[in-house]
Amino acid sequence: MPRSPHPPRRATLASLAAELKVSRTTISNAYNRPDQLSADLRERIFDAAKRLGYPGPDPVARSLRTRKAGAVGLMITEPLDYSFSDPAALDFVAGLAESCEEAGQGLLLVAVGPNRTFEEGSNSVLAAGVDGFVVYSASDDDPYLPVLQQRQLPMVVVDQPKDVPGVSRISIDDRGAMRELAEYVLELGHRDIGLLTMRLGRDWPHGDPRPALADPERVLSPHFHVQRERIHGVYDAMSAAGLDPSSLTVVESYEHLPTSGGAAAEVALEVNPRITALMCTADVLALSAMDHLRSRGIYVPGHMTVTGFDGVRDALRRGLTTVKQPSMEKGRRAGHLLHNPPGSGLPVIDVLETEVVRGRTSGPPA
């Protein structure tokens, strides 16, 4: 039998209503307000929709009608390959996604990493179909924050930047947590300490992305608040112990690669071969440093103490001495705060608890 030259017309809300002899409002309620209809009527509508090929209300039309996009935008300033390989970041995203799902919202990644031009990143921020933004760990001089604020949408910052006027923030006491960990390292008897940090600014130090000794000016005024606070936590502990904080060997790892911690550890030991403890501002740096030390025949903790920060699963499994922070809870809280803003209209600063985990990678100096 020859096919009809005219394909069947796509079912619409109106044609489905006519088929079932009900109003368009009834069809709309089946999808948008199911509590308004009986279970039998909803089932009859969905069965007919499936038979006729009706896909449901047009999401674009619904968005225009309600002025709601039904999604939260997550602005990520790191390369996506890093964001999806960093366990702490993954836990945060999982918590945020869980919160969005509970609120009936989707989650849209707005990637504005260093590999994009400013124009590309700005277009992504301005074109994102979202009802609000969560900003995850951006520098205080991030160029996209002013662009995002042009949208005049609800916003929550996680970790950094600090003190964005009128914006709520979810964070931990990075300085206090790192000080507590450093006090423990000092109690063990360590005096020659290396500190391996994540990047301190958006620009390359010395025009080179490889790990390098951080100069005092860059250490004292980094644009990443979290790294600054963790560095100063170690300084606080050293000062309280009567030590000169300037004796701390600080190495910045600009690139976030699987081998970055090992490369940074090598630089630290070249600068100060007397180092007996390597403290790291992230577990991923510490785990990489441990692998590198082992390849050189430097055993942990027999020859070297190594500590991290985050408390990711792999670090805890390997017995890393670290600070455990609630990364997944950060995501949940950020989503909840965005979906349920304070009635006062004033920003909320929510500081979550941390825990120092004394693992198997710390001991007295050899």
Swiss-Prot record:
Function: Transcriptional regulator that negatively regulates transcription of the mce4 operon, which is involved in cholesterol transport and utilization. Acts by binding to the promoter region of the mce4 operon.
Cited SMART domains: HTH_LACI
Name this polypeptide is given: HTH-type transcriptional regulator MSMEG_6044/MSMEI_5883
Phenotype caused by lack of the gene: Deletion mutant has better growth ability in a cholesterol-supplemented medium compared to the wild type. Deletion of the gene alters the composition of the cell wall, leading to its remodeling. It enhances the hydrophobicity and permeability of the cell wall and resistance to ethambutol. Deletion of the gene also inhibits the host innate immune response to M.smegmatis, and promotes the survival of M.smegmatis in macrophages and infected mouse lungs, leading to reduced transcription of TNF-alpha and interleukin-6 (IL-6).
DNA-binding region residue numbers: 13-32
GO MF entries: alanine racemase activity; DNA-binding transcription factor activity; transcription cis-regulatory region binding
Domain HTH lacI-type: 11-66
Keyword Nucleus assigned: no
Classification lineage: Bacteria, Bacillati, Actinomycetota, Actinomycetes, Mycobacteriales
Keywords, alphabetical: DNA-binding, Repressor, Transcription, Transcription regulation
Pfam families listed in its UniProt record: Peripla_BP_3 (PF13377)
